[in-house]
């Protein structure tokens, strides 16, 4: 049921599925960096929701990994591709101690907690809506509220659990729309007028444009307050001071990755792109940069509001929890305190060496391909 919310890029099938593991670094002593004199390395196993790591989405992890920020913080970061067949893998692996930090969608996180899994969000990557609606370029729809009574194309019927809460938030009865399950060509169905709208997301828009699809969009962050995919950990670990410190340091590295990206987006895109050989076969550098910029802007949602990177918005979560309960997606009406905490987020933002990241970014030398790329005018994060 929640498989589609977990692997929103499943239809693109870039890279190998399954629990393939990629790690860099080895056991070492962190030395004097970041005040961790003599500290031994500790491993954090992060699991993707997609069944692949061959996407630009995780630039905020590749940058601190490749720039040595995790290493300086005493962390060996292991990135796990995850499972494309197990919808709850990104929470289940964490609950079973096969991973330490997952990246579940709100639907997967709440379903997992509702079923008794002891996991909790410590970082909302976007702190707002990642999903959008794509429209034909000649569509007369100008507001998402006009989707009432319209047809919406989906890549899978399971995506209904993504769209239903979005419609309810807009005051639309999900029963009033007609879902069109069109497989991997769902956005082609929109472009050719076979559906009034289609589910899209940040990072996908640039890829669709690169494929020659002409569409316009109702951008979710402009009208939705619902949360997006989060970094979640075992709830019990949050009662362990050593684990809290470990995850906070990991998030400090994430903050540095984001600050680096803000200072030099092309460098962040180059680092990420060059780390992903399979992705290089399907995306050219400019398109990879464009895809990353869409996501990077969204990742900066709470930062632009002065709340720091990765803030879990209580109001947005509260509304979402009520909506999914009313829709029957959770049996219990979950309390926000059982779903997320911002305690680690606050400390990570305060302690991260943002100045070092910005300095490194400005000094980073671009290769020939990325030196020719352009950052779109007005980009912010």
Regions found by a protein language model. Give the residues of each.
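Short glycine- and hydrophobic/aromatic-rich loop-to-beta-strand nucleating segment
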Residues: 132-134, 230-233
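N-terminal secretory signal peptides
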Residues: 1-10, 17-25
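Conserved C-terminal helix/tail region of periplasmic/extracytoplasmic solute-binding proteins
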Residues: 318-381
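Solvent-exposed alpha-helix faces
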Residues: 16-17, 99, 195, 252-259
């Amino acid at each position: 049921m929640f498989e589609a919310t977990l692997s929103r890029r499943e239809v693109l099938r870039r890279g190998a599925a399954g629990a393939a593991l990629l790690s860099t670094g080895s056991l070492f002593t962190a030395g004097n960096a970041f005040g961790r004199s003599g500290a031994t390395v500790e491993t954090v196993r992060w699991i993707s929701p997609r069944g692949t790591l061959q996407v630009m989405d995780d630039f905020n992890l590749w940058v601190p990994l490749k720039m040595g920020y995790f290493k300086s913080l005493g962390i060996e970061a292991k990135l796990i591709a995850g499972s494309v067949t197990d919808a709850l893998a990104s929470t289940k692996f964490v609950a079973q101690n096969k991973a330490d930090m997952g990246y579940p969608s709100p639907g997967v996180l709440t379903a997992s907690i509702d079923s008794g899994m002891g996991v909790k969000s410590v970082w909302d990557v976007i702190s707002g809506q990642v999903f959008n609606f794509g429209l034909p370029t000649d569509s007369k729809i100008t507001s998402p509220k006009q989707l009432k009574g319209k047809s919406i194309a989906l890549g899978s019927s399971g995506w209904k659990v993504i769209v239903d809460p979005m419609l309810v938030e807009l005051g639309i009865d999900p029963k009033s729309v007609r879902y069109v399950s069109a497989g991997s060509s769902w956005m082609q169905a929109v472009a050719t007028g076979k559906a009034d709208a289609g589910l899209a997301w940040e990072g996908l828009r640039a890829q669709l444009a690169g494929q020659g699809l002409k569409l316009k969009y109702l951008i979710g962050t402009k009208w939705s307050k619902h949360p997006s995919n989060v970094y979640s950990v075992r709830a019990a670990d949050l009662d362990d001071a050593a684990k809290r410190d470990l995850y906070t340091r990991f998030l400090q590295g994430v903050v540095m990755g984001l600050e680096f990206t803000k200072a030099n987006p092309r460098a962040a895109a180059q680092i990420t792109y060059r780390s992903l050989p399979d992705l290089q076969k399907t995306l050219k550098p400019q398109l990879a940069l464009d895809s990353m910029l869409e996501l990077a802007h969204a990742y900066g949602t709470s930062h632009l509001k002065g709340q720091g990177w990765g803030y879990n918005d209580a109001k947005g979560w509260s509304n979402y929890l009520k909506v999914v309960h009313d829709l029957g997606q959770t049996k219990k009406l979950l309390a926000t305190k059982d779903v997320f905490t911002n305690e680690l987020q606050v400390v990570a933002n305060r302690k991260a060496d943002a100045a070092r990241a910005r300095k490194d970014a400005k000094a980073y030398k671009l290769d020939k391909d990325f030196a020719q790329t352009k950052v779109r005018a007005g980009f912010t994060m």
